[in-house]
Amino acid sequence: MCHVSDDIYDYIYVSQGKTKVDSIDDNEELEYTEDAFNVLGFSTDEKFDCYMLTAGVISHGGIEFKTKGRDDQAECEAIGPDTFPGKVAGALQVDPFPLIKAYCKPRIKVGTEWVVKGQTCEQATNAVGGIARAIFDRVFKWLIEKCNDTLIDATLKKANFCAVLDIAGFEIFEYNGFEQISINFVNEKLQQFFNHHM
């Protein structure tokens, strides 16, 4: 369904930290997630889209570029269905060739004209990471919104009270990976939410 392998180390975005915790069974956690989706009233299509977009995000990390020509322009040599570009495109339900072209040779507006600009490997890789983060951000926000819509009882009256919440952060940017930045982002958003609504 999601075209992902069983080897976590195939996915750089989710394998940079500790990948195995003895007390956690990943299959059992997936079942709990599925049960939670059902309890919260997610439709089959919504669950499918969430899984596919998540597969697309983690597969983005496997897209690699090589330098082509003297201009150091990036290109992606393998774009078949079993490659990371193919898996990303399949998960996002888009054609892989325009997707990779958008990373390697994006169209930019210069004055009133649209031009194609060749990217270096570093620029193309940064674009891939940016799109993966943007998709992750939107999926996460959608999940929170969907949960809130299900859990919030509009008939309850608001009561005024004062609350203080401080969530510890781990801002060691030289060492933190994507996972820790995501955790910090969630903590900040939770603190903003509680400060605003409590």
Across the structure, where does each feature detected by a protein language model lie?
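N-terminal switch/interaction subdomains of large nucleotide-dependent motors and GTPases
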Residues: 1-198
